[in-house]
Amino acid sequence: MMDEAKEFDAVSLGILWDRLVSITDEIESTLVRTSFSTIVSESYDLTVVVLDREGRLVAQGSHSIPVFIGTAPRTLKYMLQKFPPETLMPGDVICTNDPWMGTGHMFDISVMRPVFSTAKGTLLGYTMSITHLPDVGGIGFGAAASEIYHEGLRLPIVKLAESGVINEFLLDLIAVNVRTPESTIGDLRANIACNEVGGRQLVEFMNEYAIDDLSALSNAIRNQSELAMREKIKDIRNGTYDNSILIEAIDEPITLSCKVEVEDEKIEIDFDGTGGCVSRGINVPFCYTNAMSLYSIKCLTIPNLPNNEGAARPISVSAPEGCLLNAQPPFPTGARHAIGHFVPGLIFGALEEAAADKIQADNGMIDLLTVQGTHPDGRPISTIHFVSGGFGALHGLDGRDCLPGPSNMAAVPVEIWESITGMSVI
């Protein structure tokens, strides 16, 4: 259901909307330029968002990867349960890497900063960045863990800074639990810095256009996105469609199943029939399954529309609790992408007859090389190299090469990889 919204003419709404997206892109640029790890600075395993005072996603950075679609509002709700809006102060920064409150595994850190009016001191909204950390301790990145506790340091919702003062105890605690404290702490500070830049730019934007409350603009943007999504869903033939695939797991193959119901201007996706969780780190929390599902439908409908919460409203996603695509603690989730990346192909397979001219062929998927150890000069190493198989072909179009489908991260240049690891690529 759409929210009540102030009327904006099309030109004004377009200008204001673009400005908000440009703010997220500036946050992203700051994050990339100040980060220490190549997984952020080269591979762009990240997202940045602006949310309104009610915690609704208004704008998301242009380079955000699909697995982060829709996760920030959910994470913010958990954060505000712990630290209610009326208790927040300028300069507060809140973070968590909990897989079930964040993005599905502990290697992603979600960092949020509330934004306040400089004139009145009132809460205007929030900025949030999410990045894959180079290391979180534990067994390391991969599927080897048999419990979530093996995978590293799991942070509850906690203040990374309070009233502008960084929580040095928290940084020290993290530093002594990871293999690469310099790059890990450096990336955390980059998250703090980019959110500060984003907050400042959001205040300047609202002052420039005499906007006291972001909610009206937020409602207009999200309503427009919802209308666009509903109109495009109408192009998909009504009906109930299903698909199942058998994939390699750890000890034995496992089934992924989905049912997609298209009714006029809405879509329901259900993963009932999917196999259960396993004792290795390929289990997928629902937040990840939901993100991959939203991404799949967006690819078929309005791929060029900037991400916001409105476009997700006509789409509902469900998965039985305890199945592989709705894993619960203490199942490990470190390599949840190994299963989660099958979700778009599963959905596309179900809809191959209903939207044949829009369906994408299977992706080349993504392979990861994780390196942990010691550089020849004595420095500790914990880094990831993406091997990208490319995107599947579309109707009348070849697939894109060297992209880690279904994602939009970038491979680290060989020269940089050799420099940071001391290894040679032949």
Task: Give names to the regions the model predicted.
Residues 2-90, 95-119, 123-268, 272-426:
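Glycine/proline-enriched, intrinsically flexible loops and inter-domain linkers
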